[in-house]
């Protein structure tokens, strides 16, 4: 059984193809980069409409399959930007109707959880979901993925992008912050807004811009922003783990690619006697493979959708989805996509003061590609029939 997934919640149009065992045969994407300013939903949607057919073709070519080999198609139903979601949904509907195959709309946030579980071998984690539009701490409880904490204003990724524009870094500023922070030498106190398991970031933008106007180097601002924001995320994640009794923590979302965030969460997990998991970078960011995998899980657990059921939902919370597949499928843990993170670089934020040395950030190289026989896996996937 081969499933194609189409991701289109925000700036990325991604298409992935997976089989019933979460072997990823292709994971292609094209990212919209605004010429200036921030992300405009309609401009991003126009970009997605222009590249969708090409990305779908590229994904099938890389997987070595054609349209007739796809048994199921899934797409990101939400949450996300309405115009972008509609492009992905339209492409999926057209493919499903043309090929007369089933279609499944999935929750984008849950897709991050499930691809992480499948590829790292963790079984029942608390998820720190740190992305552009969302920042949440999520865990499975009573048949659904419950949100135990979240941002009260903007997502961590949006905060970094907005601050990056204000500081002249351009759009998609997260990687720039990570690079600059490694060169920083002083930590400056910024608003630390944590209430229970919720966080807020907007005050940090105002304070960081004020530091910039005072002549504080960008490197020190980046260091201070990362340390403060990531300490907040680590604190609420630890509080949620204690509250719900989880011994595993999974990172997901685009900001989970940041080496310093990984280091801080890993250090916290070790201190609690827990374990941290994180998939390869390509599965942290928005991607089609995670959409395909969740669609396959849902279909194999009995979920069915008509075309009339595939209306997109800009606001679509994880706890609105009944997670039937966790009752119907046992997981066979695969090797983690990343090595364990060393905690020797970690340092408690509370011990830092202006003028102290910064903690070191960690840059992770991508793992070596899998060595499984590609053709054999494709043949096996093709031989697996759809569930009735």
Model-derived features: where do they sit?
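Low-acidity, Ser/Thr- and Arg-rich intrinsically disordered low-complexity segments
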Residues: 330-353, 364-365, 376-388
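Glycine-rich beta-strand-to-loop/alpha-helix junction loops that act as flexible
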Residues: 75-78, 95, 131, 249-258
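A short helix-loop
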Residues: 8-9, 26, 122-123, 128-131, ...
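Glycine-rich phosphate-binding/hydrolytic loop that grips phosphoryl groups
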Residues: 279-318, 322
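N-terminal beta-alpha supersecondary unit
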Residues: 2-79, 108
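A contiguous, well-structured pocket-lining segment that forms one wall/lid of small-molecule binding clefts
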Residues: 66, 179-249, 258-272, 296-302, ...
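Conserved phosphate-binding catalytic cores of ATP/NTP-utilizing and phosphoryl-transfer enzymes
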Residues: 1, 101, 105-126
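Conserved phosphate-binding/catalytic loops in two-lobed NTP-binding clefts
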Residues: 105-106, 266-289
């Amino acid at each position: 059984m081969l499933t194609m997934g189409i991701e289109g919640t925000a700036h990325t149009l991604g298409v992935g193809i997976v089989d019933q065992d979460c072997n990823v045969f292709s994971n292609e994407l094209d990212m919209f980069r605004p010429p200036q300013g921030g992300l405009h939903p309609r401009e991003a949607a126009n970009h997605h409409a222009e590249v969708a057919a090409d990305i779908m073709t590229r994904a099938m070519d890389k997987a070595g399959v054609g349209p007739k080999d796809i048994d199921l198609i899934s797409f990101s139903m939400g949450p996300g930007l309405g115009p972008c979601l509609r492009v992905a949904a339209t492409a999926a509907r057209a493919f499903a109707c043309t090929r007369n195959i089933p279609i499944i709309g999935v929750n984008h946030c849950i897709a991050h959880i499930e691809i992480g579980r499948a590829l790292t071998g963790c079984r029942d984690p608390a998820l720190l979901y740190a992305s552009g539009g969302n920042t949440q701490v999520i865990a499975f409880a009573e048949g659904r993925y419950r949100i135990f904490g979240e941002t009260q204003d903007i997502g961590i990724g949006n905060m970094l992008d907005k601050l990056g524009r204000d500081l002249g870094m351009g759009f998609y500023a997260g990687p720039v912050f990570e690079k600059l922070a490694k060169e920083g030498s002083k930590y400056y106190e910024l608003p630390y807004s944590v209430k229970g398991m919720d966080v807020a970031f907007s005050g940090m933008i105002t304070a960081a811009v004020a530091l910039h106007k005072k002549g504080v180097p960008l490197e020190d601002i980046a260091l201070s922003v990362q340390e403060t924001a990531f300490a907040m995320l680590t604190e609420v994640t630890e509080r949620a783990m204690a509250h719900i009794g989880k011994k595993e923590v999974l990172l997901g979302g685009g900001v989970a690619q940041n080496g310093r965030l990984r280091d801080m969460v890993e250090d916290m997990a070790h201190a609690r006697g827990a374990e941290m998991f994180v998939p390869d970078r390509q599965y942290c960011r928005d991607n089609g493979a995670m959409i395909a995998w969740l669609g396959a899980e849902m279909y194999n657990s009995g979920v069915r959708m008509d075309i009339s059921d595939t209306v997109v939902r800009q606001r679509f919370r994880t706890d609105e989805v009944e997670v039937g597949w966790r009752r119907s499928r046992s997981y066979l843990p695969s090797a983690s996509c990343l090595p364990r993170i060393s905690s020797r670089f970690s340092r408690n934020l509370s011990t830092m003061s202006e003028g102290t040395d910064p903690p070191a950030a960690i840059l992770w190289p991508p793992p070596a590609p899998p060595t499984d026989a590609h053709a054999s896996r494709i043949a096996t996937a093709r031989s697996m029939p759809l569930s009735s």
